[in-house]
């Protein structure tokens, strides 16, 4: 009886919160569903979610019980700061920041602050690829390398030793089936070692890095295996630039994020001094040790500020933004009728089609069609991100500004924690 009353009370609270911020959600929806369908995204007024969503919307005794449960969970994992956003049927129900955005400067976390997305960035890149397909600039079966391939530069072709590279397709890159492996470490985040091995004095840009990596043999025949690959999504970022004629970040912002109502997402910087306005500070877990700076300077740095060259991760893991805006992006690619999608129904279905043998979906980790949620995770030094899109219409998003000793395994514990919260409060 007490549990039913608790769920009812939270439901009323969340409905009140939705009504309170309804003008924000409605404004963002109107941007995508204007009766004047001939208007371009550029001609419509920009409504910035990050200017509207703050902790003040959920302050008060009514929220204290659920807030306290979440705070205890974050404290157990020694998380300095986090954002949790919950939507139902694409309507924002709950958005809250916990802990510190920058502890040393005394800045509390708000749900509108920017944090690194890590591999959640792959979902954004995948949406960009699908947009290029809809624009007739690209096909899933297009070959990536070779004289008739997308990246047909002779310097790439001259680097290739393994002829199987010529069979790699766009879809195989999206599904982590292109033949790449990480036996020698993740090549996209191994800049220092690649510099030493190839006698480079500066970190390689994307074309230089790709020419170096194409000399390696593939780990398996494209399409006949799977291995999670940041390199594959770095190459997809290069494909976006080649086919659009624009910088990757600019294309994604103009044709994917802004039409979805997301105006404050960016490629993140590597160092604390490079942070965006309203971006949080990042923290390592207790016991972590300094590492060599990615650029082979010989300096020892905190892993979250210099181990990886963030901009070079590009579409594999470099985006940053708020959990609030990220929820808008998810609402715009989920196939639900409440918010107009930025992609066609066919594209959304293709991205989320359940795959056999636990194969990867397009952009998502997995999109099962049973009673289990769609999953997208992300993990970098200093951050963790998790998206769970449930069959009942709920979407839960958690982003932290702190690493845990468990690395990407932290997401598994958070999934179980979300289930407990859903049973108790939803």
State what each model feature region is.
Residues 14-22:
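Hydrophobic membrane-insertion alpha-helices, especially the h-region
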Residues 158-373:
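Short, surface-exposed loop or secondary-structure junction motifs
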Residues 62, 66, 117, 121, ...:
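Hydrophobic (often cysteine-bearing) scaffold residues that line and stabilize catalytic clefts
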Residues 95, 107, 181-184:
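Short, solvent-exposed loop/turn elements at domain surfaces
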Residues 58, 62, 66, 113, ...:
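Residue-level signature of the cytosolic catalytic core of signaling kinases
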Residues 76-83, 105-172, 220-231, 314, ...:
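Short active-site loop at a secondary-structure junction
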Residues 2-15:
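N-terminal Sec-pathway targeting helices
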């Amino acid at each position: 009886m007490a549990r039913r009353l608790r769920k009812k009370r939270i439901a009323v609270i969340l409905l009140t919160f939705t009504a309170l911020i309804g003008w924000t959600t409605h404004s963002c929806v109107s941007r995508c569903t204007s009766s004047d369908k001939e208007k371009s995204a550029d001609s419509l007024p920009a409504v910035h979610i990050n200017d509207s969503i703050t902790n003040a919307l959920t302050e008060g005794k009514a929220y204290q019980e659920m807030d306290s449960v979440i705070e205890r969970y974050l404290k157990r994992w020694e998380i300095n700061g986090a954002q949790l956003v919950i939507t139902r049927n694409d309507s924002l129900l709950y958005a809250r920041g916990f802990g510190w955005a920058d502890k040393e400067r005394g800045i509390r976390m708000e749900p509108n602050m920017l944090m690194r997305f890590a591999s959640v960035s792959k979902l954004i890149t995948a949406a960009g690829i699908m947009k290029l397909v809809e624009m007739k600039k690209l096909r899933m079966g297009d070959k990536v390398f070779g004289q008739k391939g997308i990246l047909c530069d002779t310097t790439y072709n001259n680097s290739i030793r393994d002829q199987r590279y010529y069979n790699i397709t766009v879809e195989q890159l999206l599904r982590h089936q292109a033949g790449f492996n990480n036996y020698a470490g993740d090549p996209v985040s191994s800049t220092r070692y690649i510099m030493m091995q190839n006698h480079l004095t500066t970190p390689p840009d994307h074309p230089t890095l790709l020419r170096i990596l194409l000399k390696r043999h593939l780990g398996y025949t494209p399409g006949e295996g799977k291995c999670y690959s940041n390199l594959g999504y770095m190459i997809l970022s290069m494909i976006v630039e080649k086919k659009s004629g624009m910088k990757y970040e600019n294309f994604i912002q103009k044709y994917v994020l802004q039409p979805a109502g997301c105006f404050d997402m960016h490629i993140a910087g590597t160092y604390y001094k490079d942070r965006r306005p309203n971006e949080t500070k990042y923290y390592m877990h207790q016991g972590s040790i300094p590492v060599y700076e990615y650029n082979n300077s010989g300096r020892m740095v905190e892993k979250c500020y210099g181990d990886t060259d963030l901009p070079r991760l590009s579409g594999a893991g470099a985006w940053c933004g708020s959990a609030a805006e990220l929820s808008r992006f998810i609402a715009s690619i989920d196939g639900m009728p409440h918010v107009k999608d930025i992609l066609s129904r066919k594209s959304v279905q293709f991205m989320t089609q359940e795959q056999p043998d636990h194969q990867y979906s397009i952009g998502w980790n997995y999109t099962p069609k049973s009673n289990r949620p769609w999953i997208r995770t992300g993990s970098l030094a200093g951050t963790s991100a998790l998206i769970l899109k449930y069959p009942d219409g709920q979407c839960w998003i958690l982003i932290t500004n702190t690493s845990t000793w468990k690395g990407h395994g932290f997401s598994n514990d958070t999934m179980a924690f979300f289930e407990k919260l859903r049973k108790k409060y939803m």
